[in-house]
């Protein structure tokens, strides 16, 4: 029986693809295990949502693009992580490693290479992240979500596969969503998502502009951990720090979304054909990958994009109004998008690429 080791972590985006793939792997008759960090979000997500999967924690450092004394310490953490990962891989003897990226994946990919275990990397963003750039040297193949990403990668190693969407995404129940929120079925619903870490600026603008928004929408506000404001209570407005199991039901009643521009999330909105106003993480908080993602979706006619630095109450309202006027066109553009691979076909390709 073919055994696949999965790795990736640090953010929800680096875990969600694996969360969508592992159940398919199991249903196809493959064995699966997960290698991640000791305290990262991947451990919480995998152990809570896939308790049947063996989770192996390893030491991991952080990849920084700037000079810091912490970099010296992290070199030793990465070396320790390679040794930890080698022990796991020698014990489990997987046939291949699937790496979703994030700093924890680098020592695992290096360890796999040292044991002649083939690695397949997945890159969700339009431009490759630092971890995947490093890991690519030790990997057999890299799969991309955006076709344009192939321009940044060696042709002999890179293949475009499209987005990997979780199975339950389209199973949301609108009736349950309305019951959960207490919303009126005859009024539009706006979902605001600031990403797993939340956005203080976006949260502030939504709250300051709530009365104006509530004239047109009912608002579901996912604030991010620790950013919920219990003092803000209005009819037609509901806050959550983070939603797991009920998210598909909330998406089932959503007409429009304001969101960060992580690729996994925006491809989910695209699959559900929900018009989106994207506010990507700025260069002061990221390498600019979300800016690229947002601009690409805007160019395709799937979304509108606003730089967070330019975000004001007036601009937010203006962009929402324009998007509502263009709603039919945006949804028609979304209908042209087709998923490249089913998950079953993806695993067939993965096994063929890794083991041949």
From Swiss-Prot:
Pfam families: Glyco_tran_28_C (PF04101), Glyco_transf_28 (PF03033). It catalyses: Mur2Ac(oyl-L-Ala-gamma-D-Glu-L-Lys-D-Ala-D-Ala)-di-trans,octa-cis-undecaprenyl diphosphate + UDP-N-acetyl-alpha-D-glucosamine = beta-D-GlcNAc-(1->4)-Mur2Ac(oyl-L-Ala-gamma-D-Glu-L-Lys-D-Ala-D-Ala)-di-trans,octa-cis-undecaprenyl diphosphate + UDP + H(+). One of its GO terms (molecular function) is undecaprenyldiphospho-muramoylpentapeptide beta-N-acetylglucosaminyltransferase activity. It is found in: Cell membrane. UDP-N-acetyl-alpha-D-glucosamine binds at residues 166, 196, 290. Cell wall formation. Catalyzes the transfer of a GlcNAc subunit on undecaprenyl-pyrophosphoryl-MurNAc-pentapeptide (lipid intermediate I) to form undecaprenyl-pyrophosphoryl-MurNAc-(pentapeptide)GlcNAc (lipid intermediate II). Belongs to the glycosyltransferase 28 family. MurG subfamily. This is UDP-N-acetylglucosamine--N-acetylmuramyl-(pentapeptide) pyrophosphoryl-undecaprenol N-acetylglucosamine transferase. It comes from Staphylococcus aureus (strain bovine RF122 / ET3-1). The gene is murG.
